Every structure is written in C-alpha cells, then in structure tokens.
Amino acid sequence: MLLNSSEYLNTVESIKQEIRAAQYRASVSVNRELLLLYHTIGNTINAHKTRGSKFIESLSADIKLAFPDASGYSVRNLKYMAKFALAYPDEEFVQQPVAQIPWGHNTVLLDKLSSPEERLWYAEKVIENGWSRNVLIHQIEGGLYQRQAIASKITNFEARLPASQSELALQTMKDPYLFDFIPLKENMLERDIEQALVKDVTKLLLELGTGFAFLGNQYHLNVGGDDFYIDLLFYNLSLRCYVVIELKTGEFKPEYAGQLNFYLSAVDGLLKKEQDHPSIGLLLCKSKNDLVAEYSLKDMSKPIGVSAYRITSCLPEEFEKQLPSVEDLQKRIL
C-alpha cells in the first residue's frame, strides 16, 4: 500500500481528528475540575466571611507555603473564587457553559456583568467563537448582548427564509453595528483615519461575527451588459449563503431596499450555486425610522435586514467633520 494513497491519507486525517477531539475533551475535563475546586474553596471562604480580609490573606499565605509550585492562590484570586461561588451557588453549574471556558474568562464575566442571563450568553459565545479574554472584554464593553441578543431587529427573514435559516440569520444580525475600532486622536487628519481602517479591516470581520469570509468591496456584477457594484460582499460559512451589505451615510430610505433586492437577485443568478442557501442582504444606515423600514421590507421578495451603525460609541464633536464618508470608507477597506 502506498503511503501517499488517498485511503492512507484519509486514515491519517481520521486519527488526527480523534487525537484533537481527545485533547479537547481532556482540556475541558481539567478545566471543569479546576473550576469545581475553585467553587469549593469559594464556598469555604464565604462560610468564614465574618473573619474578615485577614482570613483570606492568611489562607493565601498558607496555601502557597504548602504548595509552593502551585499558582492561582493569590489574595485577589481567592476573592474571585468567593465571588464565583456566590454567582453559581449550585454545583450543577458544571453543566453550564461557564464550566467550559477558562478561569480568566470567568473572572471577566464576574467583573463586568451582574445578570446571570448575560453571563450565560457570553459564555456560550466564547465557546462558539473561540474568543480570547481580550476579545470577550471588547464584546462586553461594546454591548454585544444588547445589540445582538435582545435588540428589536427590522427584517423580513421569517417571511422569506426557512425557519432554521431565518433563526440563524436573526441571531447573526446586530442593531446597531459598532465600528469603534478607529483610533481617534487629537488633530487626526482624514487620511490618518482612512489608514486606520485599512490596518484594522480584520476588526470589521470581528464586528460582523463568526463565519464571515470577505469576497470584495465594490464587487463588480455584469447584468445584461450593464455594470453594477456591490458595496461589500461576503460569504457566511454558518449560513451557507452570500451576504450583500450596502452602506448608506444618511437615514434609511425605501428605495434602498429596492436596490438591494435587485443586487440579491443578481447574486443569486450569477454567483449562487445549487448547494448555497438564498443570499441575504443587510442595509447599514446612519439612522432609520423603524416603521418606514418595516413597510419597505414587507413586500420585498428577497431576505433583507436593516440596521443602524455607529462609528464610535462616544464620538468627540471635534472629530465628527474629519471622518471619511461611508463611500470613502468602503473604497479603502481593502
């Protein structure tokens, strides 16, 4: 048998996948045991809380003395353990997503969130997207839960997509989108901001969410000899469909939906393969009247969502006139 035969290569790949799966299960198991230990220690600390801070300081010193090679038993971390045990009083927390994410991620959830529902939602997103601790902090500070999980979204997805596809598309969508990755500084020139956009294009993909593959800006379509240009074209691997994004500098207008509906028909006709799901459109406007947007989408034949966008969460007035227009922005993304 040849060692480079397809059968052999498939066998090797299968074994590699089994090894990776076992490594993942082992890491999850170790993490779960560590969190159980921290939970137990936290409960013990809480049971002696009347002894005051000196108790934790003494406990930290004695643990380090008994286990000099062990880390994680500083006074600060012991206080986190106590907080962790209070946040999850039942040991059944090991069945929840928080038991599958690293301790450092859990301390972020404890520091920044008070709602159990939000903590659970962000823990699920960490598992789903493989976020680092810093990315988790960024998403919490950007209000992702409010913009994605509980925002009232203007779409016709339910009427134009199968139920499973519609639900996933809604989960993917945000309102508003936050383009806060432009590092604003005093006396910045327009070209400085443009260069920052080019440098940080990967952060645009982070804001859009998992599964987005960038295919181009000002993407050219030839329809019957006429030329058309899509602002931003993506393929979403989770939705298994093309996603057409149109950017508008002002308030939403009904004619924008008609233009995007045409682009989606063209993409479905020219690019979509048999295995692809129907293409989805997203209009990003500086502002929108929700009722006008709802009526505009009601009789559109293609699945479209309308969201607002913000350049920053808190834009200093002196920078407002220096920002490039959305048309300039989309030309310089790549």
Where are these regions (language model features)?
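Basic, low-complexity intrinsically disordered segments
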Residues: 1-334
